[in-house]
From Swiss-Prot:
<feature type="binding site">
    <location>
        <position position="455"/>
    </location>
    <ligand>
        <name>Zn(2+)</name>
    </ligand>
</feature>
<feature type="binding site">
    <location>
        <position position="535"/>
    </location>
    <ligand>
        <name>[4Fe-4S] cluster</name>
    </ligand>
</feature>
<keyword id="KW-0408">Iron</keyword>
<comment type="function">
    <text>Catalyzes the synthesis of the hydroxymethylpyrimidine phosphate (HMP-P) moiety of thiamine from aminoimidazole ribotide (AIR) in a radical S-adenosyl-L-methionine (SAM)-dependent reaction.</text>
</comment>
<dbReference type="GO" id="GO:0009228">
    <property type="term" value="P:thiamine biosynthetic process"/>
</dbReference>
<dbReference type="Pfam" id="PF01964">
    <property type="entry name" value="ThiC_Rad_SAM"/>
</dbReference>
<feature type="binding site">
    <location>
        <position position="391"/>
    </location>
    <ligand>
        <name>Zn(2+)</name>
    </ligand>
</feature>
<feature type="binding site">
    <location>
        <position position="538"/>
    </location>
    <ligand>
        <name>[4Fe-4S] cluster</name>
    </ligand>
</feature>
<keyword id="KW-0456">Lyase</keyword>
<feature type="binding site">
    <location>
        <position position="414"/>
    </location>
    <ligand>
        <name>substrate</name>
    </ligand>
</feature>
<feature type="binding site">
    <location>
        <position position="543"/>
    </location>
    <ligand>
        <name>[4Fe-4S] cluster</name>
    </ligand>
</feature>
<feature type="binding site">
    <location>
        <position position="193"/>
    </location>
    <ligand>
        <name>substrate</name>
    </ligand>
</feature>
<comment type="similarity">
    <text>Belongs to the ThiC family.</text>
</comment>
<feature type="binding site">
    <location>
        <position position="387"/>
    </location>
    <ligand>
        <name>substrate</name>
    </ligand>
</feature>
<feature type="binding site">
    <location>
        <begin position="307"/>
        <end position="309"/>
    </location>
    <ligand>
        <name>substrate</name>
    </ligand>
</feature>
<feature type="binding site">
    <location>
        <position position="251"/>
    </location>
    <ligand>
        <name>substrate</name>
    </ligand>
</feature>
<keyword id="KW-0411">Iron-sulfur</keyword>
Length: 586
């Protein structure tokens, strides 16, 4: 009897403290766009308005929703897809044991109950990509949805997609996803990588990591599984994922040929693309820019080729002494992508893996090829984003952004960090967040998170939380620097709460309320400390904000408005302060 993954096997948490799930009604019946509303307490009887923020947590934080992982989450978008009349349901390919990396299916594998569902594809001659609709002047329901999330006009969304500056990753077989957009003129997004390996993790653990990552703010998920049960793990994740899901198909294709790179073929890879597209993967990382002639250039590098996908294709090219089959079959890949609206994430297989290799000939040669491939994909109206480095010192980061925008005609940039130094294993979420904040400011549309386990091991769910929060900080800092019109509202609300000693509001407005309260309560755990006009850093006598309050009150009581009057008042106050023994609080 096949096993199942249940909600009891994983930890699911409700909404964050002081928050509640709310929905904004869209322009069409039944369209409800999720937001998180953070409540605030009053200031001396004067109400502070609730703050609404972008929410990626899906239905899991809705108290009215009953979690049943074996059924998957709701599919409100399904009707939008069908009503356009350009898709058809079909039998799909047969799921085989080798899809899960085994010769015989195991009775112990928790197969998703609805794996026999019929996938959708475009009807003969149709193109179902959001870019195709946008270029034909159509504002889809998906575009209207993301316009509400971003606080912009739907026509602006359509135009950005039509011109290739943004992508709306939305496979027609992933109707569970709550739509989002990736582009430099929108909020900077964060991706979280999850996935098993040959030596670690289970299906339940990966589903839990997905719900955990989205709770803390991951905008997309990449399933980078390389162990057994790849197909089944991905099915459980997609059916329960409220955010777009990306993959690197070459990983599964390699499993199908027993991990021997030189045995890879276009036919095996093509079959894998269709398999994953039928499941509902929203974007594929495809390392089509690793060309045979570029591989020798990497021989001079300190760390060679560090991309897993890049090294697989380099090994294949060298063994056969042939051009990369992902490059030679790129037009055929585009034909597959546009049948399902899978977006390209053109992989940087030659990204630098060390500071010494940053911005070298190999890296930028591949980027030139990615620019060429972008034009081909756009010819098919297939959505494209470009993957970027890697390990880059701060003074070389801006050049990466400028070259990408120029060479790839403004396609969204999606970067891994970049890490700004190589000397901090165990802290690479910090070394990379520095670079991520900078490159986000310069124009990167999505940041791929790095966890503290980078270069050391497979991250657990606590590492996922740390990585997501760290990168949400970087993304938000970039939004502030770019002048995003709503970015500062949460900062202003938290600053006001801090100055007014509304401790619970400070916690609740933060990116990680639980961590903030935990640190505060380590030294001041009493409930009364939540209303105290000091914290344990300065204590009651040296709190700068409390002193500022005293100064304001003094100015108000003495009707001091001009600089001259304030200086006079300060002299009087200084005299009084000395006469009372130099004590701040009596």
């Amino acid at each position: 009897m096949k096993q199942s993954v249940s909600a009891e096997q994983i930890e699911l948490k409700s909404s964050l403290p002081g928050s509640k799930k709310v929905y904004v009604d869209g322009p069409r019946e039944g369209m409800k766009v999720p937001m998180r509303e953070i409540e605030q307490s009053d200031t001396n009887g004067v109400p502070n308005p609730p703050i609404r923020v972008y929410d990626t947590s899906g239905p899991y934080t809705d108290p009215a929703y009953k979690v049943e992982l074996e059924k998957g989450i709701p599919t409100p978008r399904h009707s939008w897809i069908l009503e356009r009349g350009d898709v058809e349901a079909y039998e799909g390919r047969e799921v085989k044991p080798e899809d899960d990396g085994v010769k015989v299916a195991s009775k112990h594998t928790p197969v998703f109950p609805q794996m026999d569902r019929k996938p959708l594809r475009a009807k003969q001659g149709a193109n179902v990509t959001q870019m195709h609709y946008a270029r034909n002047g159509i504002i889809t329901s998906e575009m209207e949805y993301v316009a509400i999330r971003e606080g912009v006009d739907p026509e602006f969304v359509r135009k950005e997609i039509a011109e290739g500056r943004a992508i709306l990753p939305a496979n027609i077989n992933h109707p569970e996803a709550e739509l989002m957009i990736i582009g430099r003129n929108f909020h900077v997004k964060v991706n979280a990588n999850i996935g098993n390996s040959a030596v670690s993790s289970s299906i339940a653990e990966e589903v839990e990591k997905m719900t955990w990552a989205t709770r803390w703010g991951a905008d997309t998920i990449m399933d980078l599984s390389t162990g057994k049960n790849i197909h089944t793990t991905r099915e459980w994740i997609i059916r329960n994922a409220p955010v777009p899901v990306g993959t690197v198909p070459i990983y599964q294709a390699l499993e199908k040929v027993n991990g021997i790179a030189e045995d890879l073929t276009w036919e095996v890879y093509r079959d894998t693309l269709i398999e994953q597209a039928e499941q509902g993967v929203d974007y594929f990382t495809i390392h089509a820019g690793v060309l045979l002639r570029y591989i020798p250039i990497t021989a001079k590098r300190t760390t060679g080729i560090v991309s897993r996908g890049g090294s697989i294709m380099a090994q294949w090219c060298l063994f056969h002494h042939k051009e990369n089959f992902l490059y030679t079959h790129f037009e055929e890949i585009c034909e597959i992508m546009k049948q399902y609206d899978v977006s390209f994430s053109l992989g940087d297989g030659l990204r630098p893996g060390s500071i010494a290799d940053a911005n070298d000939e190999a890296q930028f040669s591949e980027l030139e090829t990615l620019g060429e491939l972008t034009k081909i994909a756009w010819k098919h109206d297939v959505q494209v984003m470009i993957e970027g480095p890697g390990h880059v010192p701060m003074h070389l980061i801006k050049e990466n952004m400028e070259k990408e925008l120029d060479i790839c005609q403004g396609a969204p940039f999606y970067t891994l960090g970049p890490l700004t130094t190589d000397i901090a294993p165990g802290y690479d979420h910090i070394t990379s967040a520095i670079g991520a904040a900078m490159i986000g400011w310069f124009g990167t549309a999505m940041l791929c998170y790095v966890t503290p386990k980078e270069h050391l091991g497979l991250p657990n769910k606590d590492d996922v939380r740390e990585g997501v929060i760290t990168y949400k900080i970087a993304a938000h800092a970039a939004d502030l620097a770019k002048g995003h019109k709503t970015a500062h509202q949460r900062d202003d609300a938290l600053s006001k709460a801090r100055f007014e000693f509304r401790w619970r509001d400070q916690f609740n407005l933060s990116l990680d309320p639980e961590r903030a309260m935990e640190y505060h309560d380590e030294t001041l755990p009493a409930e009364g400390a939540k209303t105290a006009h000091f914290c344990s850093m300065c204590g009651p006598k040296f709190c700068s904000m409390r002193i500022s309050h005293d100064i304001r009150e003094y100015a108000k009581e003495n009707d001091l408005e001009t600089t001259e009057a304030i200086e006079k008042g300060m002299k009087e106050k200084a005299k009084e302060f000395k006469e009372t023994g130099s004590h701040l609080y009596q």
